[in-house]
Amino acid sequence: MEKFQGYLEFDGARQQSFLYPLFFREYIYVLAYDHGLNRLNQNRSIFLENADYDKKYSSLIVKRIILRMYEQNRLIIPTTDLHKNPFLGHTNLLYYQMISVLFAVIVEIPFSLRLGSSFEGKQLKKSYNLQSIHSIFPFLEDKLSHFNYVLDVLIPYPIHLEVLVQTLRYRVNDASSLHFFRFCLYEYCNWTNFDIKKKFILNPRFLLFLYNSHICEYESIFFFLRKRSSHLRSTAYEVFFERILFYGKIQNFLKVFVKNFPAMLGLFKDPFLHYVRYHGKSILATKDTPLLMNKWKFYFVNLWQCYFSVWFQSQKVNINQLSKDNLEFLGYLSSLRLNPLVVRSQMLENSFLIDNIRIKLDSKIPIYSIIGSLAKDKFCNVLGHPISKATWTDSSDSDILNRFVRICRNISHYYSGSSKKKNLYRINYILRLCCVKTLARKHKSTVRAFLKRLGSGLLEEFLTGEDQVLSLIFPRSYYASKRLYRVRIWYLDILYLNDLVNHE
């Protein structure tokens, strides 16, 4: 962003309408292309590549785009002309692709400047471990044990394009840029009936910006409702000795409390409400009653239907009781498990037993969903029986082995925090046997003959880092294997979901 600020120096009078003129500057396209290419190289595993834009970028195309933007009628191609000359559609789609890249970079400028100004004078703490997805689970293990219900919400996408434009309208005060954005977006999406649209996709950075702006608007309204919905906790009711005119006493007590003890007013807000958003979904965990959870469900449905004009079915908001239902969260099936614990207490000559119940977060592996993903990618059938990977038989033995080892270790590292490892061992078994069958098929041999010729050392590559470390810590005994089966290890180097974990 510092590179852009070197080219963009604005006075106070032009800050409200400085975006639109940037579309007609050639150096902005160069900076946008260079910035986007560097971001793709740094985050190649997270963002998609826009190969068409990278290959077809040139200064000549930029000059043609600028000339056409001076006369927007030249960017409009009737459908009859598309049937006669499909090349016109390909050319204009390429123009809209480059404009989308530029629009994403330009509109991010005021957001970045506003964000940078808010951090001035503040010293931010860097916690690299919190960047991992697995940093969420230790937090939930500490918090979810105090909750009763979880609201599982599937965030809907806006159906009409005008919803996206109106959302940006609250953030961007440049009317000309919004009108141009609306024009390009509608022209691009009007060609849904033509095959040329399937070969071109908008820039992922642009789509990510639209999605985040849409979610930001939704969450700002939700947080406003969250602050307005604070209510008195049940532990504060002990100060009232009588139940006559109960709510009147609450109001009078609050007036006295605010006047005399303003610093302790936070005690009367309900802190047991946590919101987590992930992968197009969000969960709202709370200690409320079923009546209040139904109210929150009603709020979500009406918020999307009335404010965002999106048809949102009530079935997309599920109320899960953690003690009975499983919560699908980040590839795990999470629930609360009651562990009875008996403690013997000795007091002088008398001894007695105390029954305690510990509530613990139980994270299970969705074995059926993962087997379905493996079957979809031809690693096994729908019943979980391993089959050979026919499309990999043209590769070398080392490449085949490295592919299977990499997939096996990724899954093992991600699901290493599960409460029971039985399903994880089953997945590893499927991948190991699939690897052996693939190599045996390549060498035109049977599995038994192939293993007899190479020995069991071939499968030692599948040992994960967890197995290697724990085998050095614990001695080889029945008790050690049982402890290894129960232990949880969260790997903090996992920053995103891989394809097999993302099985929805």
Swiss-Prot record:
It is found in: Plastid, Chloroplast. Keywords: Chloroplast, mRNA processing, Plastid, RNA-binding, tRNA processing. GO terms for biological process: mRNA processing; RNA splicing; tRNA processing. One of its GO terms (cellular component) is chloroplast. Pfam families: Intron_maturas2 (PF01348), MatK_N (PF01824). Belongs to the intron maturase 2 family. MatK subfamily. Usually encoded in the trnK tRNA gene intron. Probably assists in splicing its own and other chloroplast group II introns. This is Maturase K. The lineage of its organism: Eukaryota, Viridiplantae, Streptophyta, Embryophyta, Tracheophyta.
